[in-house]
Every structure is written in C-alpha cells, then in structure tokens.
Amino acid sequence: MSSVVVVGTQWGDEGKGKITDFLSEHAEVVARYQGGNNAGHTIVFGGVKYKLHLIPSGIFYKEKICVIGNGLVVDPKALLEELKYLHDRGVSTDNLRVSNRAHVILPYHLKQDELEEASKGDNKIGTTKKGIGPAYMDKAARIGIRMADLLDREAFKEKLERNLAQKNRLFEKMYDTEGFSVEEIFEEYFEYGQQIAQYVCDTSVVLNDALDNNHRVLFEGAQGVMLDIDHGTYPFVTSSNPIAGGVTVGTGVGPAKVTRVVGVCKAYTSRVGDGPFPTELHDEIGHQIREVGREYGTTTGRPRRVGWFDSVVVRHARRVSGLTDLSLNSIDVLTGISTLKICVAYKYNGEVIDEVPANLNILAKCEPVYEELPGWTEDITGVRSLDELPENARKYVERVSELTGIQLSMFSVGPDRNQTNIVRNVYEA
C-alpha cells in the first residue's frame, strides 16, 4: 500500500497540477478531496496545454481511476462543461468516479456568493464567485443537496423546494432582489444529474479497495495551506481544508493509510485575492517575477500578488500538514535577479517571531526578516539534476530545504512535465 498526498504550502497556485500530473504516471488512482471548480490547474500533456478546474489531473491516463471525493462541492453544469472540454479534445473520461456524498452547487449558491461578496465592500474576501462558500455553508447547516439526492427525482425536488423557500426570503429581505422558482432549476439540474449518473458511486469504497489491494493512490489537493479554513489566513481563506488532514474527511480514507505528504511550493510566493502578505513585492522585481512566471489566475485571470519566498509560511505548512517531502517549482523564474531574498522570520514590535500569527492585524504589521543569497544568470530550463544547477541556484534550493525543514524530493525548472526533476522517489521513500 502506497499513498501520496500533494498539498500546496502557500496560497495556492504553487504548481500542484503539474506535480500531480507528473506523479500520476506512477499511480493507479488519483483523487481530489476538497474544494470545487474555484481552483484551476494547468497541465501540459502530449504537447497540449489543458486547463482543468474540477476533474483530477490523472484523467489523461485512461487506465487510471480518477475520483472526485465526498469533500468536494460539485457544480453539475461546470462538471459537464469540463467533460465536454475533454471529450472535444479526444480525452476519455470513462475512468472518472464522482462521490455520491459530494454536495451540489446550485444557482442560488452562485447568486448568494456574488451578493455577499458585493455587500462586503472594502472587506471583501476575494471569492471566485463560484458558489463554493455558500455550498459549504449549506453542508454545515445540514440543508445541502448531495449528488445522491440529485439523482433521486423526488428527494431532489423536495429538498430544492425547502431550500428555495429559505433562500428566496434571504434574497428578498436582505438583498432586495428576486430569488428563483423551482421550475427555473429543477428540470435543468435533474437532467444534469442524469448525465453525470454514470460516474456516481461510493468513492470511499473505490479508494479503500484500491489501497487494500496495494495500489498506488495519489490525493490531489486544491488551493494551499494558507487558504485552509482552519490553518490559513482566516477569513481570507477558502471554505474547506486543503491540508493533508482534509484527505481523511474528504475521501473516507483513514489517516493510517496515508504514507507520504508532498508539499509543493514555488521558489517565491504568490497569492490571489486580499489578505496579509508579508513578503509582497511592489517594485520592478515583483513585476519581473509576475511577467516571467505568468502569474495570472487560471480561474479568474486576475494578476497574482508576488513576493519573496517565505520560509515561515512553509514551516507552518510542514507542521499542520505533516509534510514529508518538498517539491520546489518555478526556480527558473528567479534567473537574472542579482540578489535573492528568503524570509526567515518576522519582526513585530521589535520582537522576532518564527511562526505565523493567528491575529491578522498582527500579521499585517509583521516585517519580514530576510536572508540574502546571490542569484544566477545561467539558463537552467534544461537542467535535469541538482548537480547540473549553477552553484548559486543549487545553494538557493538547498537553503530553502534547510530553512523549511523538509527534504527535497522534486524540483522544477519550467512549466513542462519533462522539466520536473526527481531527487528521491516519493512512492518508495
């Protein structure tokens, strides 16, 4: 039995999709455990670039089972659009499995998301307006509609009628806008369910059977640790748990069955949306990193905020996710910068602190304590081993591993999968 979790160690967009795709080659099952279509990942496969938001990265390997676990919230319309996107490009999806316990995003979730975000004014969270938060709210409030309900005509209609009575009062009284009729949603979404039905099953059984038969299972996280609803920069977070612990609740696989946890990070830091960002760069170097690294959101197209590598953040991720391995991406983006900086601690009111404060007012006032390292000018995009890196690039990579306390297992020097290099095999480590 071998199972590996891929976790983002920063604010998402660390290159998890590429690393998951890379590791998928040696897995027999690939599963997502949280989030929804708010997370985008770009994958280059067979020389073609694909953008996925919901379906696991392993879908391009038709012999591998791909699972959308119970911890996700699924927009049926978006899922069908993504399936069509793949079918139109000749990609089979017969290997997809969708949990019958996954919650469903409906039109009122999308509307609620947009209205709530607009009402917050300057205090907005930076939501992608995909209905993710409201769907998780309904799940916690025990009024959510699950995939199993969507496939049951009577159950779906009964729950939809109940929910709309409540949601429409919310829209009318709080937002002074019209709600939805049952007719506007019911037939359309029931039909979506019928189109998805062939993929729906108890995915906990699928995953545990695979593990019990000594198959390699890869768990794919979305977003990142700093967007985790419990351990991230709350409230500027997502509505689920991207940390490795999310695997257990989001797939129905016990924690003892997880063997390795790979933390993925960039050689710098980026984030989309609002919230404190201690190492953020507003200068020409920041602009250079953004343009060279093509730092624009896969889902939103928004320019990402960028900054120096923050080892305080990644150490936090190591602790709360139990990281065993490090995958360092986008090292090539730093080429040509004469002096590189790594944040080793924060300074607040004259005191040096080594951990991420829970109080965001404190975090916003933290000043990064930097360690400087010399940069490099050599083209490293063709490098295939640590020894081939220029001395300064290798020292930078090694210092990141030292400061975070995580053993390096992979590093990337470009966006293509053949630019990802293995230092040690995470399935056998």
From Swiss-Prot:
One of its GO terms (cellular component) is cytoplasm. GTP binds at residues 12-18, 40-42, 304, 330-332, 412-414. It catalyses: IMP + L-aspartate + GTP = N(6)-(1,2-dicarboxyethyl)-AMP + GDP + phosphate + 2 H(+). Pathway: Purine metabolism; AMP biosynthesis via de novo pathway; AMP from IMP: step 1/2. Gene3D superfamilies: Adenylosuccinate Synthetase, subunit A, domain 1 (3.40.440.10), Adenylosuccinate Synthetase, subunit A, domain 2 (1.10.300.10), Adenylosuccinate Synthetase, subunit A, domain 3 (3.90.170.10). Its main location: cytoplasm. Pfam families: Adenylsucc_synt. It comes from the Bacteria. GO terms for molecular function: adenylosuccinate synthase activity; GTP binding; magnesium ion binding. It is an enzyme of class 6 (ligase). InterPro entries: Adenylosuccin_syn_GTP-bd, Adenylosuccin_syn_Lys_AS, Adenylosuccinate_synth_dom1, Adenylosuccinate_synth_dom2, Adenylosuccinate_synth_dom3, Adenylosuccinate_synthetase, P-loop_NTPase. The keyword Ribosomal protein does not apply. Its EC number is 6.3.4.4. GO terms for biological process: 'de novo' AMP biosynthetic process; IMP metabolic process. It is found in: Cytoplasm. Keywords: Cytoplasm, GTP-binding, Ligase, Magnesium, Metal-binding, Nucleotide-binding, Purine biosynthesis. NCBIfam families: PRK01117.1 (NF002223), purA (TIGR00184). Belongs to the adenylosuccinate synthetase family. Plays an important role in the de novo pathway of purine nucleotide biosynthesis. Catalyzes the first committed step in the biosynthesis of AMP from IMP. HAMAP family: Adenylosucc_synth (MF_00011). This is Adenylosuccinate synthetase. The lineage of its organism: Bacteria, Bacillati, Bacillota, Bacilli, Bacillales.
